[in-house]
Curated annotation (Swiss-Prot):
YrdC-like domain sequence ranges: 7-189
Protein name: Threonylcarbamoyl-AMP synthase
Enzyme Commission no: 2.7.7.87
GO BP annotations, alphabetical order: regulation of translational fidelity; tRNA threonylcarbamoyladenosine modification
UniProt keyword annotations, A-Z: ATP-binding, Cytoplasm, Nucleotide-binding, Nucleotidyltransferase, Transferase, tRNA processing
Subcellular location field: Cytoplasm
Length: 189
């Protein structure tokens, strides 16, 4: 199995995020835009590029549970088990914010959207970066998400600081989103 965290283009993308850059990378179904979630300017640049209001919030993806542990340290055993039952995989959970996720990540919501990805390139990017990464579909608002590198370039051309290697997964729809407290499906897959 390939360790994508060692891929030169994945490493370059991780380095660009460390420097405040906005990048594109493949996910389970579509290409995503990403950046360092703790860099407010980088998130603002990503949202401006996408023409997405900050109030909508963004998803954080991680390579493993340890990378998002600080965001879930307040959960009880049953809630943690619910997460573990679906991760790694294409389910994003809305987890009550324990105060660690900044407003430019949560938007107007009291929760943070988290997913441990099972996409090998996206997980490799998180490992190369050393933590969770912002994940939102790679498209301007109102356009369909990019499903390949050609669509990424058509939408954003030279506006991105890096474009990762890899291909989007075979899923036809973006990840399902569920509310951890209610179990309700907020966005079906």
């Amino acid at each position: 199995m390939i360790d994508w965290s060692l891929n030169p283009r994945v490493n370059y993308a991780a380095n660009m995020m460390r420097q405040g850059g906005v990048i594109a990378y493949p996910t389970e179904a579509v290409w995503g835009l990403g950046c360092n979630p703790f860099d407010e300017d980088a998130v603002a640049d990503l949202l401006a590029l996408k023409q997405r209001p900050v109030e909508k919030g963004v998803i954080l993806i991680a390579a493993n549970l340890q990378q998002i542990e600080p965001f879930i340290d307040h959960l009880d055993d049953l809630q943690r088990q619910r997460l573990k039952n679906t991760w790694p995989g294409p389910v994003t959970w809305l987890v009550p914010n324990n105060g660690l996720a900044p407003h430019w990540i949560t938007g107007a919501f009291p929760s943070v959207a988290l997913r441990v990805t099972d996409h090998p390139v996206a997980a490799g990017l998180c490992r190369a970066f050393g933590g969770p990464v912002v994940s939102t579909s790679c498209n301007p608002a109102g356009k369909p998400p990019a499903r390949n590198i050609h669509e990424v370039r058509r939408y954003f051309g030279g506006q991105l600081d890096a474009v990762s290697s890899g291909l989007a997964g075979r899923r036809t729809n973006p990840s399902e989103i569920r509310d951890l407290l209610t179990g309700q499906v907020v966005r079906p897959s």
